[in-house]
Amino acid sequence: MPLLNSLATPYAEALLQVTEARGESETVADQCKQLLAIWNDSEDFRDAMVSPVLEPDAKKQALKALVGEDVTPSVFNLLKVLADRQRLIAFDAVMLRYLELYREQQGITLAQVRSAQSLTEDQQAALSKKVQAMAGTNKVDIDLSVDPSLIGGFVVSLGSQVIDASLSGQVRRLGLALAKAS
């Protein structure tokens, strides 16, 4: 991934500079999250965008049809540049790097939360308060994902700190304790 980061960083930094100048950094951060969701959810879209067979103009037309009206001109211009330079393979790395730089600039802490099932709005709000207390700031960006292998509960990763409140984690710890006892 270091090579991809070295490719992604200049694009992400340029996007951050442009969005700062236009006062749309927060809006673009939200759009990056939405675009990443589309990218990760649609294998066909992802395959088409990274295909060397599809011409850059065709990729730009597809991007315009899919997200052209839903993103700021700054983001759409970045997408066009990535298509022109055959760099859409680094799309997700660029979006993730932008989000990293944005959080760093704004002093926002990233908390990754994996839960066994989707959380309700009330559960998300309660978890958000707990994570903010753990982080010591109310500037926390929570990345929620569902991981059925947890069986129940959740795992919170906040920097180097990991809180495993999952059923699979409890079973694993119990197994280790039993192994030590025997």
Curated annotation (Swiss-Prot):
Q: Name one GO molecular function term.
A: proton-transporting ATP synthase activity, rotational mechanism
- Kindly state which keywords UniProt assigns to this record, in alphabetical order: ATP synthesis, CF(1), Hydrogen ion transport, Ion transport, Membrane, Thylakoid, Transport
Gene Ontology terms: cellular component: plasma membrane-derived thylakoid membrane; proton-transporting ATP synthase complex
- TM ranges: none
Any Pfam family hit: OSCP
Does this UniProt record's set of keywords contain Membrane?
yes
Its membrane topology: Peripheral membrane protein
Annotated InterPro entries: ATP_synth_OSCP/delta_N_sf, ATPase_OSCP/dsu
Q: Where in the cell is it found?
A: Cellular thylakoid membrane
Q: List the Gene3D superfamilies hit by this protein, alphabetically.
A: N-terminal domain of the delta subunit of the F1F0-ATP synthase
| Domain of life, source organism | Bacteria
Assembly and binders: F-type ATPases have 2 components, F(1) - the catalytic core - and F(0) - the membrane proton channel. F(1) has five subunits: alpha(3), beta(3), gamma(1), delta(1), epsilon(1). CF(0) has four main subunits: a(1), b(1), b'(1) and c(10-14). The alpha and beta chains form an alternating ring which encloses part of the gamma chain. F(1) is attached to F(0) by a central stalk formed by the gamma and epsilon chains, while a peripheral stalk is formed by the delta, b and b' chains.
Protein family membership: Belongs to the ATPase delta chain family.
The task this protein performs is described as: F(1)F(0) ATP synthase produces ATP from ADP in the presence of a proton or sodium gradient. F-type ATPases consist of two structural domains, F(1) containing the extramembraneous catalytic core and F(0) containing the membrane proton channel, linked together by a central stalk and a peripheral stalk. During catalysis, ATP synthesis in the catalytic domain of F(1) is coupled via a rotary mechanism of the central stalk subunits to proton translocation.
Q: What is this protein called?
A: ATP synthase subunit delta
From the UniProt record, report the name of the gene that encodes this protein. atpH
